[in-house]
Amino acid sequence: MAALQTEPHQRVALVIQYLGTHFHGWQRQLKHRTVQEEIETALERVLGHRVTLHGAGRTDAGVHAAAQVAHFDATGSIPPEKWAAILNSRLPTDILIRASAAVSQNWHARFCAKSRRYRYTLYTDSRPNLFVQPFSWHYYYQPLDESLIEAALQPLLGQHHLAAFHRAGSRRSHSWVEVQAAECYRSGSFVHIEIQANGFLYGMVRLLVGLLVNVGSGELSLDSFTQLWQQERREEVKSAAPARGLCLLRVGYPEFPFPPEVWYDTQPQFVLPSVTDVQKEASQEQQTTSFSDSASPVPHLSCTPVPVPLHK
């Protein structure tokens, strides 16, 4: 009897962008909408059989991704670079495949990754802004000193046992993490905290940011912060930062099959003017413009794209 022939398959890697607001995280879950399930469903409609999508990391409910990486094995003759367009025509508008490419059969989105980089964004203007609300923690209660947060981050560089920032429920057998880079910087009304590591514990970044905000506001001293995580006092890390401010920026590989422009944080961004900038502009126009009646001048809001410096 002739041997049963199986259809050859090719491994395809994807760079994925998604808005986490209406997802219950990355990983497929029963009775909950997830990113993995949406993409697998789209793949199965095209291929006609079950497909497993392997992601580089599992983001929590409400967390965004600018450049998540995943792979799947495809049968048929569809060119790997065509999968991005094919999937985008079938996916909901809160998921975008930025690129697709062929990779070797032993390439794995999770196990070949050497780093993951996250950015947490805090919006510090006292007035709410609906355009930034879904992507930031509106923290205006107390002034934040980003230099204190930066100072608190530096001792974390290197390999450490970070059990203090480990939420219950993780399947990971240890709490060792190699923090490769960490920084805090301000851009107008926004404070950004970026952390890159070989991997992250369950809930680590949000627990860490929740504590760093206490350092930046002066509620917690630098020494107390360092002692807390070095002594693994998990019971004192009580509150996590809101999920909406967290974004998976990029995943690092020794050999990456995509061009650099797939990374979202290398692109110019449109920055909305702050309330202070609008008030200053209105004041200047009032001083320089004469009006024939008593009507108040309307400030001109510029929509010029402002390049945001690349932080690596």
Stretches with model-predicted labels:
Residues 2-293, 297-312:
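Structured-RNA-binding interfaces characteristic of tRNA pseudouridine synthases
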